[in-house]
């Protein structure tokens, strides 16, 4: 009888011990995100979460997202500590625009070969994003899949569930002629447009780690984590009559603002009301990007736009700026039957 080598899962490229080491490393940071509604801890087959008792007619709101090719840039620059914040931000910001309070978050981390240090940095960032948004990181999936990804490359996806009172859902139906638009400043490109960012870096021959912009490396501007607006916006909703909120993600101004506008309304944006952060000027110049394309691809310094009645503007601005936001009046809503839903002038 011919002796055969005994094969193990590790021989096939899957290191269960590394996975267990990762769980042990992240338990502490995950525990810090726990909300009182969460039942049980990490390791169960499913996560249990009760609804907060303050809701009379609770409606669940769900969302899922990734961080696009910003992840490729983070891997190339070996900076993994904030990409998890981006992941949470892309999900929870989508929930809060409908008035929802994020409850819990789950992540999916897939890689060809699990590096415990890298995965721990990413998941610690996810936990930080959950802390910033007040939701619990209740579980996730770490998939080591040799042959599916090159080396230690990885991909991430996030899933979030929130809750809103049925009578307080924000859906844009109250938007009307004369409403004022308030902008919330962004921290940079957030997590959109990075295929164009990477193309601009390639064509320009620029090294983002040695190129300086506003006194710090360009890489710091490009990898600045997506701003999480949840706590500021939830407080605003409690105290001000908010008609609509648009999260400026893929598609920029042209595609995201119309998503919350009723028929026969038009958003008129005053371009003179703010200056683009320098990173957007650099991208436009280095890539020779047309103005219209900038507004279609990037947020150009505006992370969210909020529509509300004119008498509420001063109160809203005071609240938002007191909570650390950079908020300003950026435009108005006009009655219009034009097919052009957004005008920038």
UniProtKB/Swiss-Prot annotation:
Keywords: ATP-binding, Cytoplasm, Ligase, Nucleotide-binding, Purine biosynthesis. One of its GO terms (molecular function) is phosphoribosylformylglycinamidine cyclo-ligase activity. The keyword Nucleotide-binding applies. It is an enzyme of class 6 (ligase). CDD domains: PurM. Disulfide bonds: none annotated. GO terms for cellular component: cytosol. Pathway: Purine metabolism; IMP biosynthesis via de novo pathway; 5-amino-1-(5-phospho-D-ribosyl)imidazole from N(2)-formyl-N(1)-(5-phospho-D-ribosyl)glycinamide: step 2/2. Its EC number is 6.3.3.1. It is found in: Cytoplasm. InterPro entries: PurM-like_C_dom, PurM-like_C_sf, PurM-like_N, PurM-like_N_sf, PurM_cligase. It comes from the Bacteria. One of its GO terms (biological process) is 'de novo' IMP biosynthetic process. Pfam families: AIRS, AIRS_C. Its main location: cytoplasm. It catalyses: 2-formamido-N(1)-(5-O-phospho-beta-D-ribosyl)acetamidine + ATP = 5-amino-1-(5-phospho-beta-D-ribosyl)imidazole + ADP + phosphate + H(+). Belongs to the AIR synthase family. Homodimer. This is Phosphoribosylformylglycinamidine cyclo-ligase. It comes from Escherichia coli (strain K12).
């Amino acid at each position: 009888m011919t002796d055969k080598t005994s094969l193990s899962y590790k021989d096939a490229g899957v290191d269960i011990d590394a996975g267990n080491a990762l769980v042990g490393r992240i338990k502490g940071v995950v525990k810090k995100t726990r909300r009182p509604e969460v039942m049980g801890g990490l390791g169960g087959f499913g996560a249990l979460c009760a609804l907060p008792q303050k809701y009379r007619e609770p409606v669940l709101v769900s969302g899922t997202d990734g961080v696009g090719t910003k992840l490729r840039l983070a891997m190339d620059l070996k900076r993994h500590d904030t990409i998890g914040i981006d992941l949470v931000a892309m999900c929870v910001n989508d929930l809060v625009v409908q008035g929802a309070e994020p409850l819990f978050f789950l992540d999916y981390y897939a890689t060809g070969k699990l590096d415990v240090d890298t995965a721990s940095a990413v998941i610690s960032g996810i936990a930080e994003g959950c802390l910033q948004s007040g939701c619990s990181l209740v579980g996730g999936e770490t998939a080591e899949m040799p042959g599916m990804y090159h080396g230690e490359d990885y991909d991430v996806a996030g899933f979030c569930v929130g809750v809103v009172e049925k009578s307080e859902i924000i859906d844009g139906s109250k938007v009307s002629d004369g409403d004022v638009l308030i902008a919330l400043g962004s921290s940079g490109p957030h997590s959109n447009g990075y295929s164009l960012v990477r193309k601009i870096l390639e064509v320009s021959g620029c090294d983002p780690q040695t190129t300086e912009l506003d006194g710090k490396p360009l890489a710091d501007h490009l990898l600045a984590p997506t701003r999480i607006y949840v706590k500021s916006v939830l407080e605003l909703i409690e105290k001000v009559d908010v008609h609509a909120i648009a999260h400026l993600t893929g598609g920029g101004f042209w595609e995201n603002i119309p998503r919350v506008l009723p028929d026969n309304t038009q958003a008129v944006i005053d371009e003179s009301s703010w200056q683009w952060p320098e990173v957007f000027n650099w991208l436009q110049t280095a890539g020779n990007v047309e103005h219209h394309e900038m507004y279609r691809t990037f947020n150009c310094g505006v992370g969210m736009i909020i529509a509300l009645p004119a008498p509420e503007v001063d109160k809203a601005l005071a609240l938002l700026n007191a909570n650390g936001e950079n908020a300003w009046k950026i435009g108005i809503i006009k009655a219009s039957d034009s097919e052009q839903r957004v005008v920038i002038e």
